[in-house]
Amino acid sequence: MSKPIVAVVGRPNVGKSTLFNKLCGQRLAIVEDTPGITRDRIFANCEWSGHEFLLVDTGGIEPKATEGILAHMREQAQIAIDTADCIIMVVDVRNGLTAADEDVAHMLRRSHKPIILAVNKCDNVGETPMELYEFYNLGFDEVMPISSVHGHGTGDLLDAVCAHLDFSETVVEEDRIPVAIIGRPNVGKSSLTNRILGENRMIVANEAGTTRDAIDTPVDNAYGKFIFTDTAGLRKRSNITDGLERYMVVRALAAVERSRVALILVDATVGFTEQDSKVAGYAHDQGKACIIVVNKWDAVEGKETNTMELQRRGYAECFSFMGYAPIIFISAQTGYNVNKLLQLIRDVDSQNGARVPTGVLNEMLARATARMQPPSDKGRRLKIFYLTQASTRPPTFVAFVNAKHLFHFSYQRYIINQIRENFGLEHTPIRLVVRERGSGEVGAKEDRKST
């Protein structure tokens, strides 16, 4: 299912980021921050009262010197309107109601989405400042005094947010492979979906997906049953601004959440961009099976016999953090390699859901440690007592060892590579959890590596 999206909106210096950090750091159990995409902490997968949602802080958008504050606020509001299921508008009780507040509130009202007004910096517990009441002039039904610094009122705020969200699960047939098609604007996401539909006539139906404006398209063909989620509803505006890129990322995150396989589309005529890495990084950290799909190969001019291999090496370097992801060159326009892509989707999905019996796993471990002796330090050598698989999607293995600090990064990578080679898991992320054991007891120390 797709997690609901909650956006935090407000003019600079009203405490948006402080509120975001307070919710994520203390009031909410963070499921996982989004590495790569969120170096400035704009996204967090969060949980409150047993419900999960994606929290988005639009505060990272800063106006350029030539932009006015109202233009900045309009951009923030538009992002919230386009992506969120519920909006928290933050204002500053100390500064009172401003023209910028009124301007963005007017835009938000037109969205017809649930809006909660969080009046920040009400720091005295049990006291309602008189200045609070002027914010009722904005016309919102829910006006809540909070203190993002001290956490006052944030629990009530989250209760109000969750009351507006739909947490019902979208049921997907278990035998269908949910596939997210993600990428920058104009890389050919919609064209790829249309090509798949055009070549494979056994279409079940088109359904409006729960992902924001995305379309779920179930497809049956000789390669299996799929449900493709195309985020092609996002179209490039006059300029790719920082705000628009954030908008694109939020849309992509929602599609990735409900997928098992993520197709990261890249435009062969443009090449790699930082935004490609950001979107791919989120899919990687969610443990999805990923495929780097280089589209528009037919439009690349001056190709020679080694052009594809040279470009493959270049993309492999750009996406080095997910070296397991296969790279395939296609043309959605001509159909080149599209059927091969469908088979590849099945292969990576199968690997992502694979299970390895504990006995077979430890036979492999014995061979691996005999081939390359575990590292030692100051006369003490690492001993891996045994390996077991804890879960799938992605395959997650637990290693019980005598001393966690002896299990060096390089040797962890060696063991993971042995798992890949021995069990045909070359094209899925693998997580290795290290638990320290002493005197027959499982220690409290734990470490995790994902690759």
PLM regions and their residue ranges:
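Hydrophobic beta-strand scaffold residues
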Residues: 87-88, 115, 290
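C-terminal-of-GTPase-core extension/linker across diverse P-loop GTPases
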Residues: 1-25, 30, 97-102, 109-112, ...
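Accessory, often N-terminal, substrate/partner-engagement and coupling regions
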Residues: 92, 117-123
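Switch I (G2) and immediately adjacent beta-strands of P-loop GTPase domains
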Residues: 33-68, 74-86, 209-239, 257-261
